[in-house]
Amino acid sequence: MAKGKRTFQPNNRRRARVHGFRLRMRTRAGRAIVTGRRRKGRRSLTA
């Protein structure tokens, strides 16, 4: 039985562009995400 390829192919540049800090700061909702994580005391705010 043939299985498909693994779906997670790590790529740091894509990770940063899709989930990164600059992207989060671009929208109001993204800033809300970062604010919430700051308030919660998360060590890592974004990817």
From Swiss-Prot:
GO MF terms held by the record: structural constituent of ribosome
Keyword Ribosomal protein: yes
Keyword list, A-Z: Ribonucleoprotein, Ribosomal protein
Family membership: Belongs to the bacterial ribosomal protein bL34 family.
One cellular-component annotation, GO: ribonucleoprotein complex
NCBIfam families tied to this protein: rpmH_bact (TIGR01030)
Name of the protein this chain belongs to: Large ribosomal subunit protein bL34
Naturally occurring in which organism (per UniProt): Mycobacterium sp. (strain KMS)
GO biological process, one term: translation
